[in-house]
């Protein structure tokens, strides 16, 4: 019997049975009471090969060993954000790739990877549903949040932080991006770890440590040649409300040859009562700010080091060119300055939580490139699948998709895992637990035959994918990926680094065909 922890002890709905004991849902009550083994054919398609998809595959395989699981991936390689979203200088975090890879290595007949398949573009989602008993959506969240201010869409050199990290990591879909690092002043809007990733990597200019990672040589060379000297991290909230984790904030505040400043020292003046209400980790974050952030000093800033300047309680309200315009007309199409509004925190009457509102006071800082890292809006990726833009997730109960938000009616055979299930946040361990819950619901539905296709035969499934694609479409299986990886490791050794990622798709195809 498998126990899955959840936040509340309400019963599953619409025929999904369970036994409930306080905060623990004990699933499979009926199936655990019999010694009979269900051998009904089961073809499962998982869309997305990141941690959510692979963890779900492993946990379903453990519970339904004879299941045929096909994992579809838009990119030509697996592992999702582990390969393309974790900062190159955080190799310890990337080691989870070894665990994920075992899912594909140890069960090659039951769990099969097919890369370079873009749903709707290469194959219709409806065809997937027609050829599998069940489908799990585990491909993450698309759609970065915009600032929604004048100049954001009209001036050049305004980017998303996530694209920059993908570019550094050799993610194919980000290689066409051009990032201007030719000027001294750069700003990052956001108070989460991705904002720190961008700043930290730029501050590690000429770092041998960074050079030896899996960062692409192209992007490493560009960072080394950059003229960036002053990096501004801007956030609408105060130092007590940031989303930085202690490990990341400590790392960036203790970098060698970096001056760490705060633009407005008064923003660190917070009441002892407010500090006392913080969780332990948040208290430590605030202590780190007080310990390392000094009032901006121009003389120190000119000492040859790079400068990191934190701006708390500030919101960008307009992006300006060198003429002070946000229209982007004529030769003034390039970002030059940011207009910021000073904020103050008030208690929201509805939520009783602090929120930042503008004070009507403004200031302007020099800035020639801007990275946005303020969250995700989400996009509706699949026809006929509902999407809740408020929670930035697909509405579901314990991983089974609902017909609409707050509904009590399920869509049989359709499941969700990872960020699409719970919203765009959560560590790898959280995603593992998230996937466990989804796998449990799939197992229970398998026992009761509540799927898209209830036919008890083994038609369709993995073997149907190639027939549904165009004849000349290049699919990439796991053996193909291992050829790519082998070549990347070889090229990396030649350069004295972990690996050298291949960033041109045609080159990937040639490696596969000629190996």
Curated annotation (Swiss-Prot):
Enzyme Commission no: 1.18.1.6
Needed co-factor(s): FAD
The entry's keywords: Electron transport, FAD, Flavoprotein, Membrane, Mitochondrion, Mitochondrion inner membrane, NADP, Oxidoreductase, Transit peptide, Transport
Gene Ontology molecular-function annotations: ferredoxin-NADP+ reductase activity; oxidoreductase activity
Statement: the UniProt record of this protein carries the keyword Transport: yes
Transmembrane segments: none
Chemical reaction(s) catalysed: 2 reduced [adrenodoxin] + NADP(+) + H(+) = 2 oxidized [adrenodoxin] + NADPH
Keyword Oxidoreductase included in the entry's annotation: yes
Domain of life where this protein originates: Eukaryota
Membrane topology value: Peripheral membrane protein
Any GO BP: electron transport chain
One GO term describing the cellular component: mitochondrion
Subcellular location: Mitochondrion inner membrane
Residues annotated to bind FAD: 52, 73, 81, 119, 419, 426-428
Entry-linked PANTHER family: GLUTAMATE SYNTHASE 1 [NADH], CHLOROPLASTIC-LIKE
Similarity annotation: Belongs to the ferredoxin--NADP reductase type 1 family.
Protein name per the record: Probable NADPH:adrenodoxin oxidoreductase, mitochondrial
Organism of provenance: Dictyostelium discoideum
């Amino acid at each position: 019997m498998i126990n899955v922890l959840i936040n509340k002890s309400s019963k599953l709905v619409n025929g999904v049975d369970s036994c409930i004991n306080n905060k623990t849902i004990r699933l499979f009550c009926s199936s655990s009471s019999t010694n009979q083994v269900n051998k009904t054919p089961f073809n499962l398609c998982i869309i997305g090969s990141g941690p959510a998809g692979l963890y779900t595959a492993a946990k379903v395989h453990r519970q339904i060993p004879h299941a045929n699981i096909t994992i579809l991936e838009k990119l030509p390689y697996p592992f999702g954000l582990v390969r393309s979203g974790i900062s190159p200088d955080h190799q310890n975090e990337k080691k989870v790739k070894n665990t994920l890879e075992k899912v594909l290595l140890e069960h090659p007949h039951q769990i099969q990877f097919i890369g370079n398949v873009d749903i709707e573009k290469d194959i219709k989602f409806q065809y997937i549903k027609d050829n599998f008993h069940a489908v799990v959506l585990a491909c993450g969240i698309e759609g970065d949040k915009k600032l929604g201010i004048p100049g954001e869409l009209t001036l050049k050199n305004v980017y998303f932080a996530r694209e920059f990290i993908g570019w550094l990591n050799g993610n194919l879909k980000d290689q066409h991006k051009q990032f201007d690092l030719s000027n001294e002043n750069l700003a990052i809007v956001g108070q989460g770890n991705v904002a720190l990733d961008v700043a930290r990597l730029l501050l590690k200019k000429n770092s041998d440590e960074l050079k030896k990672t899996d960062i692409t040589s192209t992007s490493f060379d560009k960072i080394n040649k950059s003229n960036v000297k002053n990096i501004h991290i801007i956030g609408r909230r105060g130092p007590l409300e940031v989303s930085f984790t202690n490990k990341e904030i400590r790392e960036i505040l203790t970098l060698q040859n970096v001056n760490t400043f705060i633009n407005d020292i008064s923003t660190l003046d917070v009441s002892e009562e407010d500090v006392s209400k913080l969780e332990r980790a948040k208290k430590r974050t605030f202590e780190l700010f007080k310990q390392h952030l000094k009032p901006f000093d121009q003389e120190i800033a000119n000492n040859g080091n790079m400068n990191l300047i934190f701006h708390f309680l500030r919101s960008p309200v307009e992006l300006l060119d060198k003429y002070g315009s946000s229209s982007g007309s004529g030769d003034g199409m390039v970002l030059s300055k940011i207009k910021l509004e000073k904020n103050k925190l008030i208690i929201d009457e509805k939520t009783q939580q602090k929120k930042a509102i503008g004070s009507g006071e403004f200031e302007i800082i020099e800035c020639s490139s801007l990275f946005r890292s303020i969250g995700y809006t989400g996009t509706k990726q699949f026809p006929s699948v509902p999407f809740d833009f408020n929670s930035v997730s697909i509405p579901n109960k314990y991983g089974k998709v609902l017909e609409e938000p707050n509904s009590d009616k399920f869509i049989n055979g359709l499941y969700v895992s990872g960020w699409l299930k719970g919203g765009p946040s959560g560590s790898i361990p959280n995603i593992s637990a998230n996937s466990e819950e989804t796998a449990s619901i799939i197992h229970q539905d398998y026992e009761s035959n509540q799927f898209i296709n209830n036919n008890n035969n083994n038609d369709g499934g993995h073997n149907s994918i190639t027939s549904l694609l165009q004849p000349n479409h290049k699919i990439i299986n796991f053996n193909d990926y291992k050829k790519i990886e082998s070549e990347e490791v070889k090229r990396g050794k030649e350069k004295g680094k972990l690996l050298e990622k291949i960033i041109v798709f045609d080159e990937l195809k040639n490696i596969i065909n000629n190996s």
